[in-house]
Design a protein with these regions (language model features):
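C-terminal catalytic core of tyrosine-transesterase DNA break-rejoin enzymes
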Residues: 1-5, 75-80, 94-118, 125, ...
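Conserved tyrosine-mediated DNA breakage-rejoining catalytic core shared by Y-recombinases
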Residues: 1-49
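Phosphate-coordinating loops and pocket residues in cytosolic domains that bind phosphorylated ligands
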Residues: 8, 16, 125-128, 143
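Catalytic-site neighborhood detector that most strongly recognizes the C-terminal catalytic loop/helix
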Residues: 25-29, 41, 115-140
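Residue-level marker of regulatory loop/turn positions in helix-turn-helix DNA-binding domains and
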Residues: 68, 90-91, 115
Length: 147
């Protein structure tokens, strides 16, 4: 999900029973359903139980004004500094997600759908295969072709 989609998310668009988030306002203007899996589901469920929110409430409200989304700048910068990572923006997580999906066998269509891209060209722009992954793929192909 994009940062704006996350920060603008309200509880009425979170379906814990079916483990999914429905994004109504997206960058490309198309409604998108995002599955809530593993750790993300657990974190969102626990947050819901803790806050007991109303439908229109933001999932991540500002502590100063619950009608406004929280600012993540300070937390992001602190996390990046602690992890000793340089030159990494929140948006770069989308590139990482696309790359990990590709390296774990997701099709271009699946990656496009998960990231909310309309074109496969955008998927290509976001997906970056590691050198190790490319070597592994070539090794697999060589074993099949040459035994």
């Amino acid at each position: 999900m994009r940062r704006g989609e996350i920060l603008g998310l309200s509880w009425e668009n979170v379906d814990l029973q079916n483990r999914r988030i429905t994004l109504v306002r997206t960058k490309n203007g198309e409604r998108r359903v995002v599955p809530l899996v593993c750790k993300a589901y657990e974190l969102i469920k626990n947050l819901y139980l803790k806050l007991e929110p109303e439908g229109k409430d933001l999932v991540f409200p500002s502590p100063n004004n619950p009608k406004q989304p929280i600012s993540i700048r300070t937390a992001w910068e602190t996390a990046i500094k602690r992890a000793k990572i340089e030159n990494f923006r929140f948006h770069d997580l989308r590139h990482s997600t696309a790359s990990y999906l590709a390296m774990n066998g997701a099709s271009l269509l699946e990656i496009a759908d998960i990231l909310g891209h309309k074109t496969l060209q955008m998927v290509k722009r976001y997906s970056h295969l590691s050198e190790d992954h490319k070597a592994t793929v070539l090794e697999k192909m060589n074993k099949k072709v040459f035994g």
